[in-house]
Amino acid sequence: MLACVTMKMLRHAKCFQRLAIFGSVRALHKDNRTATPQNFSNYESMKQDFKLGIPEYFNFAKDVLDQWTDKEKAGKKPSNPAFWWINRNGEEVRWSFEELGSLSRKFANILSEACSLQRGDRVILILPRVPEWWLANVACLRTGTVLIPGTTQLTQKDILYRLQSSKANCIITNDVLAPAVDAVAPKCENLHSKLIVSENSREGWGNLKEMMKHASDSHTCVKTKHNEIMAIFFTSGTSGYPKMTAHTHSSFGLGLSVNGRFWLDLTPSDVMWNTSDTGWAKSAWSSVFSPWIQGACVFTHHLPRFEPTSILQTLSKYPITVFCSAPTVYRMLVQNDMASYKFKSLKHCVSAGEPITPDVTEKWRNKTGLDIYEGYGQTETVLICGNFKGMKIKPGSMGKPSPAFDVKIVDVNGNVLPPGQEGDIGIQVLPNRPFGLFTHYVDNPSKTASTLRGNFYITGDRGYMDEDGYFWFVARADDVILSSGYRIGPFEVENALNEHPSVAESAVVSSPDPIRGEVVKAFVVLNPDYKSHDQEQLIKEIQEHVKKTTAPYKYPRKVEFIQELPKTISGKTKRNELRKKEWKTI
């Protein structure tokens, strides 16, 4: 029976079990690879019965994490750690929920006392996958300070922009980026506190490791209203500077229960590994809120760079039951010989970030016996659509709407389109705004207003819904190619390209043409075995393959072989960069 979370249940800690445990605890059966959901019976009942009351006050640290500590002490949860960290040097950290609570309260006292931060002050966090990153997340929750994550790939210019535009009061980083911060700090009038995660001291910085040794673990969590701003995520658009996307204590702290309970299908017995970079909102999705609201263990491997063999070895060595990664990672993994790896505990694999092509899911299934359950969402949302356990997977589809949202395909006037017709993917926000949606773009009311059309929030993505209610991604609205009157989405062309044995990966954009206005151009990364082939002949073979695989008018009239595709830190292909280069605008 699907649990219903009511306002009364959320107001009282003693009722927390019904919020977080959502179904029975399951034991780990190493040979059990069933796709039967643990937390719901089927998609239809999940969608129909789901309710989530939003209390006036909510704080994830107090109302979720501390409640798991109480259950842990009472012996009412499995012995999995709350947090499990490893690195390539063989070092390992395991924290129970009680230890996570104690350490995060110490960190909270450092923020409040040593850094003199007040509720609502903003904290930029730029760290790789180190344990302190998770402590900082929880410490900000406890103090009511607003967390602003950033990737360690940020340049000095990027850091300056983020510090100035966010008006951040504190920054937390490491030895690598501290010099860049020091170089721009005089230009950031709101910045008054700097914490460094390092074995060494640095002038003008508080050394977190040393301060943690002396900090008290006695701290009272602030009482935050559900609609207070909890975090701000910088998200890049197709033009201009990155936007600041604001989320509240309820939009992510409660909203991501949808991800954890339904899409990830987590229980307290699970060990969840998400490979996302710490600077991406996907880490909040699958490395913090979704697993911990379900009482699951957050597992992470501090890999400085992507290494397919390290990922395969880790999945084989450790009792990871749920694995989440970007399509690019899965594509690179299946190119390896996986016969020697046995994933004895792995039961559930999910992917997000951009569409995953059917050829990758088929290869993964053939090599592991497991399906990949694709999910679709944005920095601005929790899970919008997904493939859920217990429902048929249509290869290439992003599944059906999550319980959080009423999703439709709409036209330019905000009218709902029938099945089969392409339009803009929208989420209904009137008359009642759903709980798992961002509040606004900070200091950018015009951009916030531009996302609304009629009764809908417009995602900026194009797609269609089929007769069975499955949603299909076509392209970002700005990625659609208009050629000789045809509208061509890059994903379908890329899907066809990637099925050719010579293609490791591809990206499709528009290219100027004097007759057709624009045509399809494919940037192709070749598999190693094909790099010595005659390129002109190979281009013809690839073009003919696409003509036979999809509608002939979609084939790439131009093909360019490149060494690698430009990617964002989350693994998404930067089609916009390729398109601008093609049109000579950069």
From Swiss-Prot:
GO terms for cellular component: mitochondrial matrix; mitochondrion. ATP binds at residues 235-243, 374-379, 461, 476, 572. One of its GO terms (molecular function) is ATP binding. Its EC number is 6.2.1.2, 6.2.1.17. The keyword Nucleotidyltransferase does not apply. PROSITE patterns: AMP_BINDING. Belongs to the ATP-dependent AMP-binding enzyme family. This is Acyl-coenzyme A synthetase ACSM3, mitochondrial. It comes from Pongo abelii (Sumatran orangutan).
